[in-house]
C-alpha cells in the first residue's frame, strides 16, 4: 500500500490586481524585499564587527573582566549566526492595517535607521514571533485584529537577490474569509515535496497552531493531535517563540527537546537553527543517561516494570546494598598497633554516614572519617599504656618525638599522650593502603552502569532490592531504552565520583582558549561564502596567545555546555511522542527542568510503548498532580483524506473514543494494495519501490521522499531507500510509503498503523 502527496505548486495571483498593475505591484514588493536584504546585510556586518572588536580587546587583569569580554564576543557571534540564518525567505508577508499603516513580516526583526516606514516608526520588518505580527496568523473576517489585508509572498531566487515571484491576498473587509484552512498559500506549502529534513512553517502557521505557539512560558501544556496536525512543528516553533520572548532567561538555561529516535532528531534538528535559535539540546529517551546510547528494547513486561516509579525504591535499595558490612573482621596493621574493622565498627560508621543524608559518593567521605575515628579510638585503647604513670607517659612522649618534655610530666600528661597518639594514628591510617582498601570494599566508588548491571544480573541482588525477578538478564547485556532513566536515577543517587587530580592551570587555560576559538570558527563557518577575504578569529589569535588572557573555565554556547553536563537544569522542556514515555522517563526529565515549564506533544491513539501513557493523567499525575493543561489540534494539514480514511477505519476498531483529525485536502489518488505469496514478498517490495521511485523522478532528482515501513526490515532485500519499523518511523514524513504486511503490524499493535 502506498500514499502519495500531490507535489504540484499552485500559481498564486491576487484576483484584484491584473496585468500590468499586478506586475507593478509585484515589482514594488520585490524592491521592498531588496531593501530589507540590504538592512539585514548592514546589521549582520555591524554585529560581526562588534564580535571581532570585542574579541580583539585586551581586557584588564581581573578574571571577571576577561570572562565578560569572552561572553560578549560569543553573544555577538551568535547574533551574527541568527541574522544569517534569516537570509533565505527573509520576508514572507505583509499586513495592511485599518489606520493605513503597512507592516512586513519575516524571519527576524529589522529596524530602519532612517525611519522611513509608512507607519512612521523604524520597524522595517517584524519578527514573526513579535506580538505585532500575530494578526498575520490569526486575523480572520470575523476577528480582523485591525487588519484589512494580509498578503502572502511566494519567494524565488536566493539571498540576497530574492524576488517576489507571486503574492496572494486575504482581504478581511470583504464577505470572503480567505484565511481558512483552504488558503492557497497553505495548500501550496502542503503539496510541496518533502525533503530529508523538516522545514519550518513560519509562512503558513494556522490560527489554532499560533494560539498554542504563543502560550505563556510557565506550566505544562500537552498538545494532542492526530497524524498530520503539525504537532511537532508547533512545538518547535513554540520553542523559537519562547526563546524570542524570554531571551534573557532561556538564553542562560536553554531548552531540551526529546524525540522518539535518533532518526527523528536528525529529521527535525535543522528547524530551530533555520529560525536562528541555537540554545537547544536534542536527545532521545535512550540517551537520558549521560554517555549512554541505548537502542535495544526490552520485552513488554520487562519494559513496563522498568518504567514504573516503583523502580525508584528498588534503585535506592540497590545503592544501599553496596554500603556493606564485613563478613569477618578486616585487619589493618599500623606501625605500633593492629586494629580491626568488625561488623559493629563498620555498622556504626555506616550509620553516621547515612545520617548525613548525602548521596553515596558524598557520604563516602563521612564514612571514611567516621571509620577512621573509630579505629583511632580502638588503637589508642589497644596500645595499653599506663597513662597515670608519669615516667611511662614521658617515655611514650619521647617515642612520639616530644622528648623535650623529659621526666617533668604533670597531671595533664595523660590527655596529651592520648591526643598525640590520636594524631599519629590518624596520620598512619591516612597513609595506610589497608585502610583505604577497607573503605573501598565497604563503601566503594561506583558507576551507574556497574550498579545496574550487577543488580540485573544477580538474583540475590534483585531479591535484596525488592525487584521483580523477571528483570534478571545476563551479565554485560546491551543497555535498553528502558535502562536509560534507571541509569540516570542511579547517577543521581550516587552523585559525582571523587574528582581526579586537576589538570595544570596552563593546560586548562590552553584547552579553554582552544574551545573559544573553535566556537567562534564554527560560527564563522555558518557565514562562509559571503566574503572570502573576511578575517576570522583564528586569523589573528592562536590558542596559546588567547590562553594567556583567559579565565581557566569553559566558554561555549549554552547548548554545548548543557549537552556535556548531566546536572544541567533547563528553562523549558519539549517532549515529542510523549505518549510513549514511561513514568520513569518523566521523573528524570522533570528533574532536568525544575521550573516545570514543559510542552508535551503526543497522540494517545498512537501509543505503542508498553510503559507509555494510557491517559495523560495516568502518566502525568504521579509527577505533576493536576498542574497541567491540554490543547488539541483538530485539522490534518499533511495527510490526504484518502490515506486518513484508511487510518480512521483502523482507529474506529481499536480506539473508537478517539476522533481522527479532518484532512484539508484530497489528492484524487486512492491507496493500492497487493497480496502476494509469502515467498514472493521481498521481490514484490523491491518492485514496488522501483515503481513508486520512478513516479517521483530519477533517483538523483526526485521530487519527494520514498520509504518502506515493515515489521521486520531484516527480512527484506537491500533497498536503495530507508527501511523503517513502525517505531523508528514515528514522527517522520514521506511523500510515498510502501507499507509491508500491515496485518502483521496491526496484530502486534494497532496503534503502529
Predicted segments, located by residue:
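Alpha-helical structural signal
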Residues: 2, 47, 51, 79, ...
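Conserved helicase NTPase catalytic core signature
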Residues: 344-572, 581-585
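Conserved helicase motor core of SF1/SF2 NTP-dependent helicases
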Residues: 248, 253, 262-306, 494, ...
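P-loop NTPase Walker
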Residues: 2-19, 23-51, 55, 179-181, ...
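ATP-hydrolysis module of ASCE/P-loop NTPase motor domains
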Residues: 297-385
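Extended, charged low-complexity regulatory segments
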Residues: 1-202, 207-211, 545-546
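Hydrophobic alpha-helical scaffolding
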Residues: 191, 254, 258, 298-308, ...
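A residue-level signal for conserved active-site and pocket-lining positions in enzyme catalytic cores
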Residues: 315, 490, 643
Amino acid at each position: 500500500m502506498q500514499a502519495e502527496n500531490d507535489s504540484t505548486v499552485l500559481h498564486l495571483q491576487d484576483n484584484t490586481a491584473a496585468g500590468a498593475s499586478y506586475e507593478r505591484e509585484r515589482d514594488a514588493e520585490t524592491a521592498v524585499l531588496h531593501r530589507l536584504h540590504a538592512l539585514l546585510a548592514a546589521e549582520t556586518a555591524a554585529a560581526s564587527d562588534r564580535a571581532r572588536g570585542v574579541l580583539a580587546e585586551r581586557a584588564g587583569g581581573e578574571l571577571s573582566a576577561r570572562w565578560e569580554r569572552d561572553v560578549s564576543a560569543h553573544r555577538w557571534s551568535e547574533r551574527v549566526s541568527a541574522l544569517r540564518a534569516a537570509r533565505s525567505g527573509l520576508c514572507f508577508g505583509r499586513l495592511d492595517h485599518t489606520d493605513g499603516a503597512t507592516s512586513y513580516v519575516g524571519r527576524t526583526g529589522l529596524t530602519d535607521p532612517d525611519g522611513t516606514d509608512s507607519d512612521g516608526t523604524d520597524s522595517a520588518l517584524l519578527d514573526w514571533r513579535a506580538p505585532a505580527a500575530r494578526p498575520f496568523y490569526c486575523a480572520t473576517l470575523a476577528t480582523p485584529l485591525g487588519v484589512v489585508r494580509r498578503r502572502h509572498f511566494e519567494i524565488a531566487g536566493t539571498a540576497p537577490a530574492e524576488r517576489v515571484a507571486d503574492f496572494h491576498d486575504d482581504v478581511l473587509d470583504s464577505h470572503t474569509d480567505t484565511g481558512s484552512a483552504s488558503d492557497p498559500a497553505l495548500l501550496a506549502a502542503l503539496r510541496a515535496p518533502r525533503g530529508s529534513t523538516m522545514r519550518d512553517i513560519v509562512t503558513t502557521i494556522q490560527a489554532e497552531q499560533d494560539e498554542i505557539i504563543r502560550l505563556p512560558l510557565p506550566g505544562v501544556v500537552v498538545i494532542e493531535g492526530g497524524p498530520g496536525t503539525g504537532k511537532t512543528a508547533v512545538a518547535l516553533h513554540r520553542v523559537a517563540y519562547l526563546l524570542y520572548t524570554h531571551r534573557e532567561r532561556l538564553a542562560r538555561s536553554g531548552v531540551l527537546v526529546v524525540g522518539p529516535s535518533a532518526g527523528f532528531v536528525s529529521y527535525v534538528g535543522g528547524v530551530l537553527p533555520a529560525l536562528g535559535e541555537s540554545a537547544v539540546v536534542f536527545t532521545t529517551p535512550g540517551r537520558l543517561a549521560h554517555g549512554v546510547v541505548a537502542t535495544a528494547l526490552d520485552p513488554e513486561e520487562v519494559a513496563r516494570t522498568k518504567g514504573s516509579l516503583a523502580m525508584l525504591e528498588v534503585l535506592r535499595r540497590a545503592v544501599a546494598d553496596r554500603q556493606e558490612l564485613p563478613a569477618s573482621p578486616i585487619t589493618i596493621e599500623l606501625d605500633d598497633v593492629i586494629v580491626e574493622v568488625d561488623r559493629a565498627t563498620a555498622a556504626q560508621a555506616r550509620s553516621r554516614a547515612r545520617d548525613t543524608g548525602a548521596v553515596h559518593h558524598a557520604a563516602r567521605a563521612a564514612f571514611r572519617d567516621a571509620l577512621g575515628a573509630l579505629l583511632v579510638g580502638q588503637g589508642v585503647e589497644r596500645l595499653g599504656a599506663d597513662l597515670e604513670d608519669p615516667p611511662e607517659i614521658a617515655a611514650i612522649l619521647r617515642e612520639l618525638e616530644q622528648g623535650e618534655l623529659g621526666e617533668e610530666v604533670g597531671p595533664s600528661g595523660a590527655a596529651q599522650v592520648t591526643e598525640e597518639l590520636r594524631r599519629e594514628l590518624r596520620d598512619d591510617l591516612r597513609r595506610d593502603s589497608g585502610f583505604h582498601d577497607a573503605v573501598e570494599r565497604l563503601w566503594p566508588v561506583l558507576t551507574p552502569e556497574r550498579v545496574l548491571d550487577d543488580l540485573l544480573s544477580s538474583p540475590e541482588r534483585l531479591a535484596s532490592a525488592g525487584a521483580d525477578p523477571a528483570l534478571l538478564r545476563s551479565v554485560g547485556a546491551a543497555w535498553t531504552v528502558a535502562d536509560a532513566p534507571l541509569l540516570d536515577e542511579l547517577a543521581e543517587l550516587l552523585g559525582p565520583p571523587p574528582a581526579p587530580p586537576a589538570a595544570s592551570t596552563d593546560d586548562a587555560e590552553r584547552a579553554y582558549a582552544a574551545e573559544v576559538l573553535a566556537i567562534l570558527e564554527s560560527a564563522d563557518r555558518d557565514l562562509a561564502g559571503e566574503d572570502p577575504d573576511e578575517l576570522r578569529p583564528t586569523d589573528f589569535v592562536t590558542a596559546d596567545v588567547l590562553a594567556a588572557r583567559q579565565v581557566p573555565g569553559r566558554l561555549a554556547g549554552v547548548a554545548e555546555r548543557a549537552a556535556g553536563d548531566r546536572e544541567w537544569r533547563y528553562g523549558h522542556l519539549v517532549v515529542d511522542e510523549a505518549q510513549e514515555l514511561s513514568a520513569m522517563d518523566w521523573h528524570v526529565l522533570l528533574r532536568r527542568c525544575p521550573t516545570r515549564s514543559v510542552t508535551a506533544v503526543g497522540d494517545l491513539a498512537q501509543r505503542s510503548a508498553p510503559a507509555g501513557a494510557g491517559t495523560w493523567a495516568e502518566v502525568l499525575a504521579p509527577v505533576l498532580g493536576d498542574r497541567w493543561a491540554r490543547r488539541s489540534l483538530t485539522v490534518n494539514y499533511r495527510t490526504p483524506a484518502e490515506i486518513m480514511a484508511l487510518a480512521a477505519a483502523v482507529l474506529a476498531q481499536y480506539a473508537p473514543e478517539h476522533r481522527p483529525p479532518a484532512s484539508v485536502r484530497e489528492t484524487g489518488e486512492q491507496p493500492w494494495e497487493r497480496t502476494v505469496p509469502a515467498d514472493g514478498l521481498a521481490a514484490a517490495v523491491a518492485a514496488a519501490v522501483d515503481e513508486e521511485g520512478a513516479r517521483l523522478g530519477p533517483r538523483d532528482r526526485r521530487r519527494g521522499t520514498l520509504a518502506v515501513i515493515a515489521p521486520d526490515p531484516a527480512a527484506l532485500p537491500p533497498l536503495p531507500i530507508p527501511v523503517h519499523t513502525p517505531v523508528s518511523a514515528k514522527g517522520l514524513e514521506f511523500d510515498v510509503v510502501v507499507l509491508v504486511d500491515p496485518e502483521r503490524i496491526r496484530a502486534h499493535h494497532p496503534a503502529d498503523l
